[in-house]
């Protein structure tokens, strides 16, 4: 007579199913975590499901630090804390812990402990498994969560293609640019020179009404004359202050105009592209990937007097004589001798009782 085959499973990852188990996820996790094993437990995930007839059952994934040889069919039995009842599981070695984890997560009623140990194997295998991983990553809705999914489900790509994944997910999950809302009513600026008003009327327009080659403008004046807040109150724009960042996180190709504020002209990259409202040019600023700029919009250059800020003084340098001749054909130059406002004004709303000083914003 053949002896019955003895029970033995030797695996790092165990998949347990408890049919007709009334324990909560918390009770099951606590009991499993307290089991004494020769090799340390690294991760436990418990999923509670209901059959169509309403009977509950539990699925569990347990990951060990090394292979754990189980010879006792009752080792993973759970006990009811309120009545004399034992719950015996079906015990299997999990060939792919990633597949088991995905299976447990399909209904969402789960509880976990520890840190999941990434497993490169998948019982599904092939291209379909890779497509599933990337589809799941895209459905997360954020870059950080997408990277976590790929780290778990596509570890080879995560290690070998991390740079590309990081860059591509930056583009895919780029948040919409925050729309700037001017804190001042247009009526606050009651001393705007006529030549500035005319420049705005002719050049700051949407794409349909904008001139094919709009003219840019350089506005030079002392601090606290309202240059910045006035320039930013004219419509949708890109605001570049101190240095250039043309990444999609900051720069919009749908803006009506650019504002370049307090950038030393000696170090202004793409001087002609901005001032000449050039179209379809590429930026390869340091430490960033090339960015395609739609262009065709005017730029307001804001500066203070002085050799390290004034565009006029920069263009008056002998070495820049050719650039100056070009600039005079592509931009207007205005010097402010007084503020663009006459005093104190109501703030963003007419009902505001607090007096607001535009110069405090510039």
UniProtKB/Swiss-Prot annotation:
<keyword id="KW-0347">Helicase</keyword>
<dbReference type="InterPro" id="IPR001191">
    <property type="entry name" value="Gemini_AL1_REP"/>
</dbReference>
<keyword id="KW-0238">DNA-binding</keyword>
<feature type="short sequence motif" description="RCR-2">
    <location>
        <begin position="57"/>
        <end position="59"/>
    </location>
</feature>
<dbReference type="GO" id="GO:0016888">
    <property type="term" value="F:endodeoxyribonuclease activity, producing 5'-phosphomonoesters"/>
</dbReference>
<dbReference type="GO" id="GO:0016779">
    <property type="term" value="F:nucleotidyltransferase activity"/>
</dbReference>
<keyword id="KW-0479">Metal-binding</keyword>
<feature type="binding site">
    <location>
        <position position="107"/>
    </location>
    <ligand>
        <name>a divalent metal cation</name>
    </ligand>
</feature>
<comment type="function">
    <text>Essential for the replication of viral ssDNA. The closed circular ssDNA genome is first converted to a superhelical dsDNA. Rep binds a specific region at the genome origin of replication. It introduces an endonucleolytic nick within the conserved sequence 5'-TAATATTAC-3' in the intergenic region of the genome present in all geminiviruses, thereby initiating the rolling circle replication (RCR). Following cleavage, binds covalently to the 5'-phosphate of DNA as a tyrosyl ester. The cleavage gives rise to a free 3'-OH that serves as a primer for the cellular DNA polymerase.</text>
</comment>
<dbReference type="Pfam" id="PF00799">
    <property type="entry name" value="Gemini_AL1"/>
</dbReference>
<feature type="region of interest" description="Oligomerization">
    <location>
        <begin position="156"/>
        <end position="176"/>
    </location>
</feature>
<feature type="compositionally biased region" description="Acidic residues">
    <location>
        <begin position="352"/>
        <end position="362"/>
    </location>
</feature>
<keyword id="KW-0548">Nucleotidyltransferase</keyword>
<keyword id="KW-0511">Multifunctional enzyme</keyword>
<keyword id="KW-0547">Nucleotide-binding</keyword>
<protein>
    <recommendedName>
        <fullName>Replication-associated protein</fullName>
        <ecNumber>2.7.7.-</ecNumber>
        <ecNumber>3.1.21.-</ecNumber>
    </recommendedName>
</protein>
<feature type="short sequence motif" description="RCR-3">
    <location>
        <begin position="103"/>
        <end position="106"/>
    </location>
</feature>
<feature type="binding site">
    <location>
        <position position="49"/>
    </location>
    <ligand>
        <name>a divalent metal cation</name>
    </ligand>
</feature>
<feature type="region of interest" description="Binding to RBR1">
    <location>
        <begin position="143"/>
        <end position="153"/>
    </location>
</feature>
<feature type="binding site">
    <location>
        <begin position="221"/>
        <end position="228"/>
    </location>
    <ligand>
        <name>ATP</name>
    </ligand>
</feature>
<dbReference type="GO" id="GO:0005524">
    <property type="term" value="F:ATP binding"/>
</dbReference>
<feature type="binding site">
    <location>
        <position position="59"/>
    </location>
    <ligand>
        <name>a divalent metal cation</name>
    </ligand>
</feature>
<dbReference type="GO" id="GO:0003677">
    <property type="term" value="F:DNA binding"/>
</dbReference>
<dbReference type="GO" id="GO:0051701">
    <property type="term" value="P:biological process involved in interaction with host"/>
</dbReference>
<keyword id="KW-0540">Nuclease</keyword>
<keyword id="KW-0808">Transferase</keyword>
<feature type="active site" description="For DNA cleavage activity">
    <location>
        <position position="103"/>
    </location>
</feature>
<keyword id="KW-0235">DNA replication</keyword>
<feature type="domain" description="CRESS-DNA virus Rep endonuclease">
    <location>
        <begin position="8"/>
        <end position="116"/>
    </location>
</feature>
<feature type="region of interest" description="Disordered">
    <location>
        <begin position="341"/>
        <end position="362"/>
    </location>
</feature>
<keyword id="KW-0378">Hydrolase</keyword>
<dbReference type="Pfam" id="PF08283">
    <property type="entry name" value="Gemini_AL1_M"/>
</dbReference>
<dbReference type="GO" id="GO:0006260">
    <property type="term" value="P:DNA replication"/>
</dbReference>
<keyword id="KW-0190">Covalent protein-DNA linkage</keyword>
<dbReference type="InterPro" id="IPR001301">
    <property type="entry name" value="Gemini_AL1_CLV"/>
</dbReference>
<comment type="similarity">
    <text>Belongs to the geminiviridae Rep protein family.</text>
</comment>
<dbReference type="InterPro" id="IPR049912">
    <property type="entry name" value="CRESS_DNA_REP"/>
</dbReference>
<dbReference type="GO" id="GO:0042025">
    <property type="term" value="C:host cell nucleus"/>
</dbReference>
<keyword id="KW-0255">Endonuclease</keyword>
<comment type="subunit">
    <text>Homooligomer. Interacts with the replication enhancer protein (REn). Interacts with host retinoblastoma-related protein 1 (RBR1), and may thereby induce the transcription of host replicative enzymes even if the cell is not dividing anymore. Interacts with host PCNA. Interacts with host SCE1 protein. Binds to host RAD54 protein to ensure geminiviral replication.</text>
</comment>
<feature type="short sequence motif" description="RCR-1">
    <location>
        <begin position="15"/>
        <end position="18"/>
    </location>
</feature>
<dbReference type="GO" id="GO:0004386">
    <property type="term" value="F:helicase activity"/>
</dbReference>
């Amino acid at each position: 007579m053949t002896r019955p085959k003895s029970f033995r499973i030797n695996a790092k990852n165990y998949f347990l199913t408890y049919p007709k188990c009334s324990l909560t996820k918390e009770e099951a996790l606590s009991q499993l975590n307290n089991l004494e094993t020769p090799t340390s437990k690294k991760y436990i995930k418990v999923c509670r499901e209901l059959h169509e007839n309403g009977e509950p059952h539990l699925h569990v994934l347990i990951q060990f630090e090394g292979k754990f040889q189980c010879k006792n069919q009752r080792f993973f039995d759970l006990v009811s804390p309120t009545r004399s009842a034992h719950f015996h599981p079906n015990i299997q070695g999990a060939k792919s812990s990633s597949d088991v984890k995905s299976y447990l997560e399909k209904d969402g009623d789960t509880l976990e402990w520890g840190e999941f140990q990434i497993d490169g194997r998948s019982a599904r295998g092939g291209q379909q498994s890779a497509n599933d991983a990337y589809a799941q990553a895209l459905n997360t809705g954020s870059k950080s969560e997408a990277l976590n999914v790929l780290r778990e489900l596509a570890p080879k790509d995560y290690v070998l293609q991390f740079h590309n994944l990081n860059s591509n997910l930056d583009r895919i999950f780029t948040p919409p640019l925050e729309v700037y809302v001017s804190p001042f009513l247009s009526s606050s600026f009651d001393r705007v020179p006529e030549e500035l008003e005319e420049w705005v009327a002719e050049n700051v327009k949407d794409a349909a009404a904008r001139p094919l080659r709009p003219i840019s403008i350089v506005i030079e004046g002392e601090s606290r004359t309202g240059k910045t807040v006035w320039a930013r109150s004219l419509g949708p724009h890109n605001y570049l202050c101190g240095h250039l960042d043309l990444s999609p996180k900051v720069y919009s190709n749908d803006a009506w105009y650019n504002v370049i504020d307090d950038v030393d002209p000696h170090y202004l990259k793409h001087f002609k592209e901005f001032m000449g409202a050039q179209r379809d040019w590429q930026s390869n600023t340091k430490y960033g990937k090339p960015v395609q700029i739609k262009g065709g919009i005017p730029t307001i250059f804001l500066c203070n007097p002085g050799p390290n800020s004034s565009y006029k003084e920069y263009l008056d340098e002998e070495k820049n004589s050719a650039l100056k001749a070009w600039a005079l054909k592509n931009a207007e130059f205005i010097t402010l001798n007084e503020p663009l406002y006459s005093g104190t004004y109501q703030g963003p709303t007419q009902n505001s009782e607090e007096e607001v000083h535009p110069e405090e914003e510039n």
